[in-house]
Amino acid sequence: LDASPKITSHTDRRESLVGSDFVQTTIQVGGYKPSTIIDFEIPRQYGLKQTIADTLGIGGIMRGLRTIPVLLDIAKDIMEVCPKALWLQYVNPMCANMIAINNSFPEIKTVGLCHSVQGTAEMLAKDLGEKIEDIEYLCVGINHMAFYKKFEKKSNDGPNEDLYPRLKIIADEIVNDEKLSSRSEKINHESDKILHEKVRYEILRRFGYFVTESSEHFAEYVPWFIKPNKEELIEKYKIPVDEYIFRCEYYSELWNEL
């Protein structure tokens, strides 16, 4: 792009906003400790299992209560310092945060974003043994709950190939704990995530479309997978309870190494 970016750091937020055409937020208010830990520990005492707990449920509610006031402070600064900027908002709980921002500061141009659309497209391409650059898709829905209405392999000499029939072969086999067969020669048997996506492949079997959000997220968005006294569902669908805690520990170690 022939760009020569200059990266600077600031301890004053308003100073960092001066002259901005775009603003991006990726923050975790309260940090991993103590806030996120508490979001998991207290519900666990009452038998409530969570995987990510940043979008809905008790964890999502508490995160929203911590986060919305901070985002509204940022919104106020944007209005005063760079009112024409486009705000790219990545902080969860996304829907609650965006409702608060849009209701309080409707003049601000802002959009709530997540990496899940492009990330899942790459995952599905890998599961199928295809290159992502050969894939064409149409995704519809809301943040953290969108579906691929179309997932196709591009063709230069005819109509695109609908890849859903091949994805449904994978779905039938992994959900039923069958060994991935050679019924489709292009199934990628070595995909490292495929056996940990049973929730989403089950949803594909039931609804006919693949959802963008990860299996660990989706498992706590709907009432079908994490249930009281139904531990066998967690085992069957390989649902990683407390997954976000493990991720935070992992990334904290990486940061400490840096």
Task: Walk through the language-model features, giving the residues of each.
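A generic structural signal for alpha->beta connector loops
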Residues: 4-6, 84, 107, 134
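Conserved N-terminal Rossmann-fold NAD(P) cofactor-binding segment
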Residues: 1-19, 26, 31-35
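Rossmann-fold dinucleotide-binding core
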Residues: 90-154
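Long, compositionally biased stretches enriched for glycine and/or charged residues
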Residues: 129-258
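Secondary-structure transition/capping motifs at alpha-helix termini
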Residues: 2-3, 79-81, 130-133
